[in-house]
């Protein structure tokens, strides 16, 4: 069974355009061939996709499926071994696409590896609980000045403020100031602002189709909760996902639907395209190096290092047994990147970088397969601790995009890890 390449549930009703030079173009062609049971042609197009995104676990998995179904068992086993050695491919045991492999010694060896990978790694403790089950949070931010945390709501299009004692209140009301689904956030204590990325989704409460494709960055005064300014896009194809700010007060935000990074300069106070990332699928998490020279942008197949002065980018390099793909949240900490990988993995990983910040020298799994997890999404660093959303419940909607009944939902759990 093909592994979806991979959009959050709240974007499954939208389409992302694909061109012949894009990974998504070949994935689409491969998927069509798979559905038509032309598995050799499917393998051909997945191979082309993998050439464009050699670290993509999802593409490797799909190619292994196509190989198995077209009778190329040796290549299928080779790819599955690469996947599990990098911590992926956990669905292979139950996947009917690998029926032809399941009695082979090679597949039995893979089963043993998967069993070990599925073991929980739990180093976290409970930070606080929000008993608002239908919040469906995606972003979390911490303000060092007030000691408050902020949680964004995808479903209710609002922001919660959590006091140091764990009590919480609405920082904004639902749809206040024209908010759509609220996604990534950052609190800037120097300027006293909370920046929130907000985008239309079909699953947000009271969604209006006329807003489809709209997105923006909303800047709030932390002390008063007042909207200072919002920077919005026209109704095209945008999904602002996560953002980061510099010491100078500039803001960079990822656009996941029309792959790009946008920029709000403190000097011009306006939203502009900074970097076109056509050819990369679903830019998401974003982080800034401590010296302010480099951005790190996560996408579906890895992480880009962006030189802010030169406005150029390169892919962060990792060995084959280290996967950098699908980091929902991404954070720079002491010459390393912390990524929450919730698509092909169920983990929080720390990627240690070399002095040039270009290559991963070591990976450490901080947390994985925690029984409490219901799609962990993003986090925030407080001192030497990492706080993160453990129960986002991003898929708590039916096939029509309607939220599930409250009795099927869980309280929002925030966990913390010592770094």
Pin down the residues of each PLM region:
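Short, conserved, GDST-rich strand-edge loop motifs in beta-rich repeat architectures
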Residues: 197-213, 391-409
């Amino acid at each position: 069974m093909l592994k979806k390449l991979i959009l959050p549930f709240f974007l499954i009703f939208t389409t992302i355009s694909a061109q012949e030079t894009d990974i998504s173009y070949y994935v689409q062609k491969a998927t069509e061939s798979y559905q038509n049971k032309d598995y050799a042609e499917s393998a051909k197009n997945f191979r082309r996709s993998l050439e464009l995104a050699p670290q993509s676990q999802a593409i490797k998995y799909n190619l292994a499926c196509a190989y198995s179904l077209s009778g190329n068992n040796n290549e299928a086993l080779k790819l599955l071994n690469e996947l599990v050695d990098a911590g992926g491919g956990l669905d292979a045991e139950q996947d009917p696409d690998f029926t032809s492999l399941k009695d082979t010694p090679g597949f039995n060896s893979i089963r043993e590896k998967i069993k070990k990978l599925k073991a929980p790694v739990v180093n976290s403790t409970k930070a606080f609980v929000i008993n608002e089950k239908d919040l469906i949070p995606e972003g979390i931010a911490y303000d060092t000045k007030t000691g408050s945390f902020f949680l964004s709501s995808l479903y209710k299009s609002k922001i919660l403020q959590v006091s140091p004692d764990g009590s919480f209140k609405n920082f904004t009301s639902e749809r206040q100031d024209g908010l759509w689904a609220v996604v990534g956030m950052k609190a800037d204590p120097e300027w006293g602002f909370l920046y929130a990325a907000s985008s239309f989704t079909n699953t947000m409460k009271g969604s209006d189709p006329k807003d489809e494709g709209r997105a923006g960055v909303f800047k709030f005064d932390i002390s008063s909760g007042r909207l200072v300014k919002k920077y919005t896009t026209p109704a095209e194809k945008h999904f602002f996902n996560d953002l980061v700010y510099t010491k100078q007060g500039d803001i960079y935000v990822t656009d996941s639907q029309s792959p790009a990074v946008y920029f709000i300069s403190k000097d011009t106070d306006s939203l502009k395209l900074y970097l076109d990332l056509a050819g990369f699928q679903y830019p998401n998490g974003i982080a800034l190096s401590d010296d302010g020279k480099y951005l790190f942008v996560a996408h579906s197949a890895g992480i880009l290092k962006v030189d802010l002065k030169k406005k150029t980018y390169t892919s962060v390099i990792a060995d084959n047994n280290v996967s950098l793909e699908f980091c929902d949240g991404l954070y720079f900490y002491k010459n390393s990147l912390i990524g929450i990988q919730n698509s092909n993995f169920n983990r929080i990983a720390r990627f240690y970088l070399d002095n040039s910040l270009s290559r991963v020298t070591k990976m450490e799994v901080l947390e994985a397969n925690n029984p409490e997890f219901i799609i962990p999404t993003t986090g925030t660093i407080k001192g030497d601790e990492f706080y993160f959303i453990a129960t986002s419940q991003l898929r708590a909607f039916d096939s029509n995009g309607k939220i599930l009944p409250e009795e099927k939902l869980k309280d929002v759990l925030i966990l913390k890890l010592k770094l």
